[in-house]
Amino acid sequence: MTTKKEINSGSQRLSLKQLKAWEALEYGMYIHFGMSTFDGDELSKGDKPSSLYRPNKLDVYQWVSVARDAGMKYAVLTAKHVAGHCLWPSQHTDYHVGTSGNTTNVVEAFINACHKRGVLPGLYYCSWDNHHRFGSDSPTFTRWESAFTTSAYRDFQTAQVEELLTQFGPLVEMWIDIPTLLGHAGRRQQYDQIAGIQPDALIMMNNGFGDGTKLMLDATWPTDLMSIERWLPSSAKGYNPWHQLSHSGALERADASQLTYVPDSPGAFYIPGEVCDPIGYEWFWQPDDKLRSDAELLGMRLIARERKTNFLLDVPPDRSGRIPKETVGALMRLRKSLERFDR
């Protein structure tokens, strides 16, 4: 039975005050940039040489300045995506910017720019890695239901995430993509590692596609946040952050295999929602991708706000390493449209 105390404060790791402070950020920039920008494949096979990555006008400061000027309060950068190429010089692989056509430590530059511009930084790390497989089988090479990671890969991920958490300062959010590949124990280990090193960071285990009405426990738990990817919150009810998870032991330590999900029930865990969607139709920059219309972008922004979720809008830099001027223009028009709407 859900107690009054649970309903008021929740059984989640972070306090309601911390979670509501994150909700108050409301609007952020998602930045997909890396090897996929250069090989043109969002789900890159990880077989391209590091030298293919070579932005010739890289301007990380521009990215964060655009985010601030667009009214965004936080930003999340893809430190490592499916290609496995890292935007920092990791000590655990040679497949990173340090061996590429532009050796800038992008993660470091991004964090520094965020501090200078008053934007809170977050980082993204993908558990689907086609370059560093260590015997794992990713969805690129097998069916989704057969994909898995080995303990050797999970040790590699743990070591890299430790670098990200200890070398660059505090993060507002740590975004783990495709966490289903880690398995129940692997997700718990990953969650505990992040919470142990940066206890104030909110941890996102990507819940994938859906309107936020159901937390995919077998693929996502444990998590502090609910991702609503390429979707919008339920039109009938908006997003309900209270998720009832039933377990006979300590809820905050429960594994997904020990939990049952009770939909549409207020109670145990307060899990804020975050809509994430691109400003165009692709996560990474593509030469033929089109920006969404001004009206569609305003609608997405307003719906996310009215249905009480944060909005993480993906704004991918191009191969030069800058956000294109057309994209910047769309963001500034969106801010002005929102300001007019709020008068």
Language-model features, listed with the residues they occupy:
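Mature catalytic domains of secreted/periplasmic carbohydrate-active enzymes
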Residues: 1-343
